[in-house]
Amino acid sequence: MQIHYLEIVTKEVDAVCAAYASANGVQFGDPDAGLGNARTAALAGGGLVGVRAPLRETEEPVIRPYWLVKDIVAAVAAAVQAGGEVAHPPMEIPGHGRFAIYIQGGNDHGLWQL
């Protein structure tokens, strides 16, 4: 299993980015509109960590890993068969690939296909 995107939703984007940058020696870029205005940095071994503000007033802070999969439709079907509930069906993000979100065990889980 490989995390392709680690999404961190927080009301303190700059503070979180500064703490991660200081502790890990990474640099966060400018907000990426395609990723909800997340500021991103490279993960060791590939992928990105993205820190963004909530997109709506009701969105709670969350840390959500997106697992890299070869077939996102099949992966979503497998998650549902295992008891997961689809929170966001597969959707294309131009230039980034496709993502989906499901909830299982009270946690958000993401899937990502390049």
Question: What are the language-model segments listed below?
Answer:
Residues M1-G47:
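Core segments of cupin and vicinal oxygen chelate
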Residues M1-I3, E59-V62, H88:
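A short, structure-level motif marking secondary-structure boundaries and short turns
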Residues H4-I8, G29-D30, V76-A77, A82-L114:
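Vicinal oxygen chelate
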Residues E12-V13, I72, N107:
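A generic "binding-loop/recognition-motif" signal
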Residues V16-A19, V73-A78:
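Short amphipathic alpha-helices within nucleic acid-binding modules
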Residues A33-N37, E59-P61, I93-R98:
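Short acidic/glycine-enriched loop/turn segments that link adjacent beta-strands
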Residues R39-L43, V51, A100-Y102:
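Short beta-strand element of the conserved SAM-dependent methyltransferase core
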Residues L43-P61, P65-V69, V80:
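Conserved, structured core segments of small domains
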